[in-house]
Amino acid sequence: MNESVTELKDTTGNPAPLGLLGFGMTTVLLNLHNAGVYELNSMILAMGICYGGAAQIVAGIMEWRKGNTFATTAFLSYGLFWLSLVTLIVLAKLGWAAAPNDTAMAAYLAMWGLFTAVMFVGTLRLNVALQVVFGSLTILFFLLAIGDFIGAGPGFRHFTGYEGIFCGFSAIYAGLAQVLNEVYGKVVLPLGQVKQ
């Protein structure tokens, strides 16, 4: 009796750049607000829903399909973070729920900081670019939490915004580096591979 073996090959694209770009671009735009460049507006909320939220969720589901636990957890979690942040803002603006006070927001942001700090440990086995993204994001969440907890003034909030802009651009770099490196079949923008 002849037995045939069929081998299935994964031919789907790399979803990580989509997730990193969704996170990075939305983070830059929100932190331009935090840095005092412009007021909170519908552009930031729309980016939070669509690119920061939905695009990262799509990337997370695609990473799940590829069996990548780290990326699945990261993209789904941060996609849902963006949706929850927009929901917090919109519910209060519509008068459907009370806005969280500074202590509540500090707790919310600190929990995300703790989660991100643990995820940062995972990047120590991946690459330097992701270490920069997750390291700077950990700092950003804790700065935001501290700012809300102590009722920080504009100077502290603007400084935090600049740190967030750096974090967002580091994610944009990591995402675009993966795209260009794949397209050219060589290292165009280095990610700083970690020796295992």
What does each model-found stretch correspond to?
Residues 69-78, 129-136:
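Cytoplasmic-side transmembrane-helix entry/capping segments in multi-pass membrane proteins
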